Curated annotation (Swiss-Prot):
Cell compartments where the protein resides: Cell inner membrane
Species name: Photobacterium profundum (strain SS9)
Lineage of source species: Bacteria, Pseudomonadati, Pseudomonadota, Gammaproteobacteria, Vibrionales
Gene coding for it: atpB1
Quaternary state and interactors: F-type ATPases have 2 components, CF(1) - the catalytic core - and CF(0) - the membrane proton channel. CF(1) has five subunits: alpha(3), beta(3), gamma(1), delta(1), epsilon(1). CF(0) has three main subunits: a(1), b(2) and c(9-12). The alpha and beta chains form an alternating ring which encloses part of the gamma chain. CF(1) is attached to CF(0) by a central stalk formed by the gamma and epsilon chains, while a peripheral stalk is formed by the delta and b chains.
The protein, known as: ATP synthase subunit a 1
SUPFAM superfamilies hit by this protein: F1F0 ATP synthase subunit A
Length: 262
């Protein structure tokens, strides 16, 4: 982790674990290879597990995995029905995908902080490796921008371009003289949705990762479990809530896009 001949300090340890495996010069076009790899890996894991369960599903005595998946699907479906009152068969599958994918990416934060990076460095020569995709603002903002694109698409599709423009121009004050103020207010509100959606997930997961790193960096190895185990138990609640909040806000935003008034 430290350069050859250089003593490993707490500062260098923390810096090392907060550095991505990247391609580029650190500018806008820099690609974080590790975040992309683990986000795709968790996405494939979700697809393979659900495909396997769907393929082996039986009306008889279900397996434990089938019971778990059915409970998860029912939970998401009920959440969608309570929030989304339009007619769009894609919303529930989208909500399920978002919840499960983010949950799997968040769970990566429960893996011991040095386990995979140490193996990658010594076996493959990879100097830096961050395994929690949702602790990378590029991943969370990319997902939020995807939701934002769906919001705009369904707003125009359901209301028409003119109807959507009218909604922006005449809300909340239905008077021509207030159009400039309405536009400013609505555009700022619209842009704030994906920013808050992505930054909320990133902030919570990045903070959780930093706490694990600080525990590993500042406490002796024999005492690390005193801090890491209680925090990991509490962090399970955080990673679940953050996946649920992202899913629910996505459903709420898409429900607003399907309504004539909001």
């Amino acid at each position: 982790m430290a350069a050859p001949g250089e003593a490993l300090t707490s500062s260098s340890y923390i810096t090392h674990h907060l550095t991505n495996l990247a391609v580029g010069d650190g500018g806008f076009w820099t690609v974080h290879i590790d975040s992309l790899f683990f986000s795709v890996l968790t996405g494939l894991a979700f697809i393979l597990v659900f495909h396997s369960v769907a393929k082996k599903a039986t009306s008889g005595v279900p397996s434990k995995l089938q019971c778990f998946v059915e409970m998860l699907v029912e939970f998401v479906d009920n959440s969608v029905k309570e929030t989304f009152h339009g007619r769009n068969p894609l919303i529930a599958p989208l909500g399920l995908t978002i919840f499960c994918w983010i949950m799997l990416m968040n769970i990566m934060d429960l893996i011991p902080i040095d386990f995979i990076p140490y193996a990658a460095e010594h076996a493959l020569g990879i100097p830096y490796l961050k395994i929690v995709p949702t602790a990378d603002v590029n991943i969370t903002m990319a997902m939020a921008l995807g939701v934002f694109a769906l919001m705009l698409y369904y707003s125009v599709k359901v209301k028409g371009l003119g109807g959507f423009a009218k909604e922006l121009a005449l809300h909340p004050f239905n008077h021509p003289i207030m159009i400039p103020f309405n536009l400013l207010l609505e555009v700022v509100s619209l842009i704030a949705k994906p920013i808050s959606l992505g930054m909320r997930l990133f902030g919570n997961m990045f903070a959780g990762e930093v706490v694990f790193i600080l525990i590993a960096a500042l406490m002796p190895w024999w005492a690390q479990w005193l801090g890491s185990v209680p925090w990991a138990i509490f962090h399970i609640l955080i990673i679940t809530i953050q996946a649920f909040v992202f899913m629910m806000l996505t459903i709420v935003y898409l429900a607003q896009a399907h309504e004539d008034n909001h």
